[in-house]
Amino acid sequence: APDAAPASLYAPSALVLTIGHGGAAATATPERAVTLTCAPTSSGTHPAASAACAELRGVGGDFAALKARDDVWCNKLYDPVVVTAQGVWQGQRVSYERTFGNSCERDAVGGSLFAF
């Protein structure tokens, strides 16, 4: 039997992103969730899929490499927000969780990625 042809020329990049209030994903109730597909084109329920995919491509899909913008100043009011990303980035499994001190700190790091 001939070898099966690959289903796509692109490695899959499909993620589910969530946001919730709390100190950890295990105890926080997800308040919002979106899907994000970055290959072969940007799509999903994310409101800014193209910009979010561009941010991820800029750090090679390494969520931990996302840094806070220098031009954003946030207060220190502690109201923890946890974000998660589960799925596949360029064929590799992704499981990411990060807790920010508040929504402003989340927005300063994620840019459009966590803006949903």
Swiss-Prot record:
Per its UniProt record, what Gene3D superfamilies does this chain match?
A: Subtilisin inhibitor-like
Repeat listed as a keyword:
no
A GO cellular component annotation in the UniProt record:
extracellular region
Q: Name one GO molecular function term.
A: serine-type endopeptidase inhibitor activity
Q: List the disulfide bonds.
A: C38-C53, C74-C104
Site residues (Reactive bond), renumbered to this chain: K76, L77
A Pfam short name: SSI
Q: Where in the cell is it found?
A: Secreted
Q: What are the protein's UniProt keywords?
A: Disulfide bond, Protease inhibitor, Secreted, Serine protease inhibitor
Top-level lineage group: Bacteria
The stretch of residues making up the signal peptide is none
Q: Do you know which InterPro entries this protein is assigned to?
A: Prot_inh_I16_SSI, Prot_inh_SSI_I16_CS, Subtilisin_inhibitor, Subtilisin_inhibitor-like_sf
Kindly report the protein's main subcellular placement as a broad class: secreted
Does the entry feature the keyword Secreted, yes or no? yes
Family designation: Belongs to the protease inhibitor I16 (SSI) family.
Q: How does it associate, per the subunit comment?
A: Homodimer.
Q: What does this protein do?
A: Inhibitor of subtilisin BPN' and trypsin.
* Descriptive protein name: Subtilisin inhibitor-like protein 4
